[in-house]
Amino acid sequence: MANERTLSIIKPDAVAGNNIGAIYDRFEKSGLKIVAAKMMQLDDEKAGGFYAEHAERPFYNDLKSFMMSGPVLVSVLEGENAIAKHREIMGATNPKDAAEGTIRADFASSIDENAVHGSDSAESAAREISYFFNEEEVCARTR
């Protein structure tokens, strides 16, 4: 089993719903450690850059607009198999398909406003973490 880091974003809908604490509680209870976090308001440049791989997709502008609609909480999570564990805790992208007890089943209202983002691979995690954090902002937790 590999100790990994993954990027997590609590999206504007979940922030507005005051679900940050409940979502963080699920991360920590699953064994993931929060090693970096910042609340931020994404602008067009930051949201567009983060989702650049989707620029040609029909949902791109709506996605950017949603991600700029309110503050987000961007975090780095660390732990054994953090990427897969985080994705399991999040649940399916569409909350209608998400398993009971997952973040999206409990806190998301639609496929568009689905509460959280998580890296889907080690490569994506490295790219996404470095997009929002510099090395000094990520603090290893040894105890």
UniProtKB/Swiss-Prot annotation:
Pfam family, one: NDK
EC number of this enzyme: 2.7.4.6
Compartments reported by the entry: Cytoplasm
SUPFAM superfamilies recorded: Nucleoside diphosphate kinase, NDK
NCBIfam families in UniProt: PRK00668.1
Assembly and binders: Homotetramer.
Name of protein: Nucleoside diphosphate kinase
Lineage of producing organism: Bacteria, Pseudomonadati, Pseudomonadota, Gammaproteobacteria, Moraxellales
